[in-house]
Amino acid sequence: MIHRAPLHLLYLNVLVIATCGLIYELLAGTLASYLLGDSVTQFSLIIGVYLSALGFGAWLSQYVTTKLARVFIEVELALALLGGFSTPLLFLAFPMIEWFQWLLFGSVIVIGTLVGLELPLLMRILKEHLEFEELISRVLAFDYLGALFASLLFPIFLVPRLGLNRTAIVFGLLNALVGLWGTYLLRPLLAKKGLDGLRGRAFLVIGLLIAGFIKADSITSLAEENTLGGRIVYADTSPYQRIAVTRNEKGFQLYLNGHLQFNSVDEYRYHEALVHPVMSVCKDARRVLVLGGGDGLAVREILRYDHVESVTLVDLDPAMTRLATQFEPLAELNGRSLERDRVTVVHRDAFLWVGEGDEQFDAVVIDFPDPGNYSIGKLYSSRFYNLLRERMTEDAGLAIQCTSPLVAPKSYWCILRTMQASGFDVTPYHAPVPTFGIWGFALARIAEDPESDSDWRLPPELSAKVAGLRYLTPSTMAGLFDLPADQQPRDVPPNRLNDQILVRFYDEEWGQNQ
């Protein structure tokens, strides 16, 4: 017989196991998005498979006819081990196993099945002590409350503070503690024989998870080094992304969510090609806007022009600009550009920021990550470009990176078509960057009328006001605008906010080249 006080403690168990269950689901979805890309597809698949596994676990519970309390505790301990170590082990397995997705979804099915077993078993344990209506209402209320806790804790505290690996281990520990606690709360329902062994296994699982928590940083570094192919020298997890910097004998590399952003060996080619064409067109630009580019490297190039009075950099993630100022190798590489008096840093979603203000700029440089998901894809939409157009002066120019026109031609030309549909005259150009291959850019200005100034479409002459470039020369600048036959325009529709075809193009084209 379970007394009234332990009954209330069992409700707390419901709250804990519900929170743990949703956290495991969120971890799987986040991990899949981080490693495989396309967050909408990955989360949709994870949620669907996980919910199906919950149902399968609930169905299986009918075949547990005896020793309910013992089976419940065994399930908690199994879930503690599998759920707690699932994320670290999947991180380690990713670069080594070709059939990683099968392993990922297999773990989701097993964890979901175990979670699906928990509540039916606990409800059957409680049914002898509560009326049916009271049992259902209380258990489900605590179950949904646990889901609320999980959904709030995960993005606000757990991922930014603990990271994915430690979050998984912490909730594995909670499951193990529920199991250990159950050996005392449910003592009247447990046979004395084997009880010490059950508690011993619970302590063993807790010990393993504590050891895993202590070594979580080492596990994370090993997994990322295997995935990224270099020694991790800096890592940070923000509410928006995972930031990692690797180093090899040639230099250091920045990765965001596992995707390479630049290599210090040849980043100057990319950033000179991004910045100097538009600054050569906007010869006397005084106010310059940089969207993205929190590494400070594009700003470094803009500050070469003495006539620039102010640079406003808008980057969503403070962790990125903190890296640019506090990680000494990057601070040296960007010339401490973000610390200059002429530079103002704004931490804001660029989509919202562009739509809220009215200050206008003489030149705009856009250095967003590639449109690999819908949250970034909105920054390449016609709606965004329409808003941005209102923040540009009449003679302003705009430069944007547009992924590779060779590897992803539909993605590249979709970006340009979107800008044209938003009222810009657009000129394509490209540059060879050894780390990335052929990389695409676009130079644009507001179209005044269908018969736009033809001089705009001519290759701009490299400004005589800039010095110290390592890549661009007057003849090199002209060559950027000479597209070969295999990079000619494609007939693709524009990218709209409510139909982000660009993200699908990008996933399709880059997925084929992985």
From Swiss-Prot:
Residues 211-446 form the PABS domain. Keywords: Cell membrane, Membrane, Polyamine biosynthesis, Spermidine biosynthesis, Transferase, Transmembrane, Transmembrane helix. Residues 198-453 are annotated as: Spermidine synthase. Its main location: membrane. The active site is at D367 (proton acceptor). It comes from the Bacteria. GO terms for biological process: polyamine biosynthetic process; spermidine biosynthetic process. Pathway: Amine and polyamine biosynthesis; spermidine biosynthesis; spermidine from putrescine: step 1/1. SUPFAM superfamilies: S-adenosyl-L-methionine-dependent methyltransferases. GO terms for molecular function: spermidine synthase activity; thermospermine synthase activity. Its EC number is 2.5.1.16. It is a multi-pass membrane protein. S-methyl-5'-thioadenosine binds at Q241, D315, D349, A350. HAMAP family: Spermidine_synth. Homodimer or homotetramer. This is Polyamine aminopropyltransferase. The lineage of its organism: Bacteria, Pseudomonadati, Planctomycetota, Planctomycetia, Pirellulales.
